[in-house]
Swiss-Prot record:
Sequence segments annotated as region (Interaction with the histone H4 N-terminus): 370-374
Protein name: Histone acetyltransferase type B subunit 2
Gene symbol of the encoding locus: hat2
Assembly, per entry: Component of the HAT-B complex composed of at least hat1 and hat2. The HAT-B complex binds to histone H4 tail.
Placement of WD repeats on the sequence: 136-176, 187-227, 237-277, 284-324, 328-368, 385-425
């Protein structure tokens, strides 16, 4: 057979594989849609003009008098194609006030439940989602996070390695056509996705990049008249791409970092004379570590998400071996986040298009063979509403089981798992209603 023929056969096989995968994705989505009325108290969807790689609920909530909803704010970006302008964006999202949802209110065509007080037979239940501010941004927004001490201050990771800092109160609602951040943090030589504000010290920021470095920035050293700021510290403790960084929520001097070099490392910024880590572990994951999350309520517990499809749980006092491994995802785990109020609950997103909830208090529970087919005992729930890779997700601090998730195909979803599933009385879960 000629080499040309081999290429044709290979291309044909790839097309067949793609068609098969598409068919599987569509079948899974159909099943999810059928079961959605019983799985969610609310599920609302909107298609963005451009996909966003980043999403984060802002910490405030506005009650609207005599209305069946409250207004929440969401921080998103854009990932445009070709030369289209990118934006840092603030959206208002109107979330229905809590009420007992009726599965009969499910809008099958839209795949939504939990609208504004009317069943699907009345008004259409469209998500009340409105972009209220668009700020010109250079290149796509890899990641955007607000400063905890002042949510108007937002840091963004750019595709050229720069970190931009914005005071959104100093920008108009509509874009001006000029990229005009309040500060530009200069030091990284390649783009990155690791970005974490210190929850303890206003103006302190940690970033990680594909240039293999972690950099610490002190925004309080900024002087008017010069937008450019250099890092106060540069760490070179990783030997490959740094994927994620996080300040410890309870220890102001500790920062966790993870990398393609398959290590988890802990920096102690009190050690001023070193560019190395204070503690590290390697060989516990089998592939790149993509994400890190410290438990906000248990100071020694942290989690890592890996391209080996697993989530590792660790005790900060002994990083030599994992405490436990969570296994159910069928592809790389890309982001993880602890529940803001439930100490034992962790959420994870994966390239398998799913977001999983894990309840660590269930670890080691006995299962029937039938239960084991649905996953390990810790697997509390899987969100299957996306048919494309998930870019980012965020817990809502004002409504503890509400999440926002964004996928690579422009779809943004806001959803709340049914109380029957995540509430204390798990016997209420209508499993007999679910379709296989």
């Amino acid at each position: 057979m000629e080499p040309y023929d081999d290429a044709v056969v290979e291309e044909h096989e790839e097309q067949e594989e793609e068609r098969t995968e598409e068919k599987i994705i569509n079948e899974e989505y159909k099943t999810w849609k059928k079961n959605a009325p019983f799985l969610y108290d609310m599920i609302l969807s909107t298609a963005l003009e451009w996909p966003t790689l980043t999403t984060q609920w802002l910490p405030d909530k506005q009650e609207v008098p005599d209305k069946p909803y409250s207004t929440h704010r969401l921080l998103i970006g854009t990932h445009t194609s070709s030369d289209a302008q990118n934006y840092l964006q603030i959206a208002h999202v109107q979330l229905p006030n809590p009420s007992a949802p009726n599965p009969d209110d499910y809008d099958e065509e839209r795949g939504e439940i939990g609208g504004y007080g009317g069943s699907s037979k009345k008004a259409p239940m469209e998500i009340k989602f409105n972009i209220v501010q668009k700020i010109d941004h250079k290149g796509e927004v890899n990641k955007a996070r607000y400063q905890p001490q002042n949510p108007n201050i937002i840091a963004t990771m750019c595709t050229d390695g720069r970190v931009m800092v914005w005071d959104r109160s100093k920008h108009p609602s509509l874009p001006t056509g000029q990229v005009n951040p309040q500060m530009e943090l200069i030091g990284h030589t390649k783009e990155g996705f690791g970005l974490s504000w210190s929850p303890h010290t206003a103006g302190q920021l940690a970033t990680g990049s594909e240039d293999k470095t972690v950099r610490i920035w002190d925004l309080t050293t900024y002087s008017k008249g010069n937008k450019l700021l250099k890092p106060s510290r540069t760490y070179t403790h990783h030997s490959s791409i740094v994927n994620d960084v996080q300040y410890h929520p309870l220890h102001s001097s500790l920062i966790g970092t993870v990398s393609d070099d398959i290590t988890l490392q802990i920096l102690d910024i009190r050690e001023s004379e070193t560019t190395r880590a204070a503690a590290s572990t390697e060989g516990q994951h089998r592939d790149a570590i993509n994400a890190i999350a410290f438990n906000p309520a248990a100071e020694t517990v942290l989690a890592t998400g890996s391209a080996d499809k697993t989530i590792g749980l660790w005790d900060l006092r002994n990083l030599k071996t994992k405490l436990h491994s969570l296994e159910s995802h069928t592809d790389s785990v890309t982001s993880i986040s602890w529940h803001p109020f439930e100490e034992a609950v962790l959420a994870s997103a994966s390239y398998d298009r799913k977001i999983a909830f894990w309840d660590l208090s269930r670890a080691g529970e006995e299962q029937t063979p039938e239960d084991a087919q649905d996953g390990p005992p810790e697997l509390l729930f899987q969100h299957g509403g996306h048919t494309n890779r998930i870019s980012d997700f965020s817990w809502n601090l004002n409504d503890p089981w509400v999440l926002c998730s964004a996928a690579e195909d422009n779809l943004l979803q806001v959803w709340k798992v049914a109380d029957a599933i995540v509430g204390k009385d798990l016997e209420d879960v209508p499993t007999e209603e679910l379709e296989p």
